[in-house]
UniProtKB/Swiss-Prot annotation:
Gene3D superfamilies: 3.30.300.10
Subunit architecture: Homotetramer; dimer of dimers.
Protein name per its UniProtKB record: S-adenosylmethionine synthase
Cofactor note: Binds 2 divalent ions per subunit. Binds 1 potassium ion per subunit.
Species the sequence originates in: Alkalilimnicola ehrlichii (strain ATCC BAA-1101 / DSM 17681 / MLHE-1)
Record's subcellular location: Cytoplasm
MF terms in GO: ATP binding; magnesium ion binding; methionine adenosyltransferase activity
Keywords: ATP-binding, Cytoplasm, Magnesium, Metal-binding, Nucleotide-binding, One-carbon metabolism, Potassium, Transferase
Binding site for L-methionine: 56, 99, 239, 270
EC number, as in UniProt: 2.5.1.6
Amino acid sequence: MSEYLFTSESVSEGHPDKMADQISDAVLDAILAEDPRGRIACETMIKTGIIILGGEVTTSANIDYEAVARETVKRIGYKHHEMGFDGETCGVINILGKQSVDIAQGVDRDHPEEQGAGDQGLMFGYASNETDVLMPAPITYAHRLVQRQAEVRCNGQLPWLRPDAKSQVTLRYVDGRPVAVDTVVLSTQHAPDLTQAQVHEAVIEEIIKPVLPEQWITGETRYLVNPTGRFVIGGPVGDCGLTGRKIIVDTYGGMARHGGGCFSGKDPSKVDRSAAYACRYVAKNIVAAGLAERCEIQVSYAIGVAEPTSISVETFGTGRVDSEKLTRIVREHFDLRPYGILKMLDLIRPIYTATAAYGHFGREDEGFPWERIDRAEEIRDAAGL
């Protein structure tokens, strides 16, 4: 019998790095809504009283970037000066430039099927049958905790909560399956007039217990709520936020490998984003088809070249079909060229702001087409099962 612990973390929409991600993706969506051919690489930095937008944009759209940034911050909940950051009054500096023509000539083609990758790189996608959304359990429940924190903050159930929060979930695994919650950490920003005891009780009863599976809670489960004792100063006042700083939160919580490229602020011509989504789509359909209990896909590209330089499939000993055959099936049934991905997943749409908090994967809301399992039957038939 194999027994071990595994931990993943998440952060709320009001965490400064996630605020930066959401601003970058709000800029992306604003451009795509007016100019589907726009090329965007928008980076955001946010700190006390100021938002800085940088990066490269080529578009015919006329965007009020300052208004996009302010509205995003206010939607998250930073709209009163007593929180230390106010979307109405903060400064916004825009230093967005144009995309290099050297990159554009490698990406743009007369025939869209020949569209080259916007950069070299490697991307991964992963799926596991340990949750209903075919994601690793630790990151799934870490996300659900901070989503619940936002829910009870916004619906007035716990009105003294503030937007910044972090969660961390440690699960006990036996023979590769999660069986118990070992430790939960939840740190949440709050109003200054709350005691630690009040915060501790409310967080456990109103956030943690409604989210975690009851059968996984044991007498040894530990709850660590605001373990420093106080969390009043938060958001961009407490920490500087930058786009792309939460790439493990965005993906699989450390359970799968990562190619290093972030997602937010990048239009879908950039394979850092689109190919990672495609890899998740492929891996999820393989697991949904019953071809493996766990599956990780790697794909790589060269700048300006349409065909992937490599595709590999790893099933960690859980596959019902050998990896060589699975790789052939992937090549035959999924077009992983940049334009093929855009078409397959219908990515040239303003759908990205919603991805920028609570994870890009395991989300079954509208606007996450890479979470569909519509190819499962097709590839199961191809495998002869």
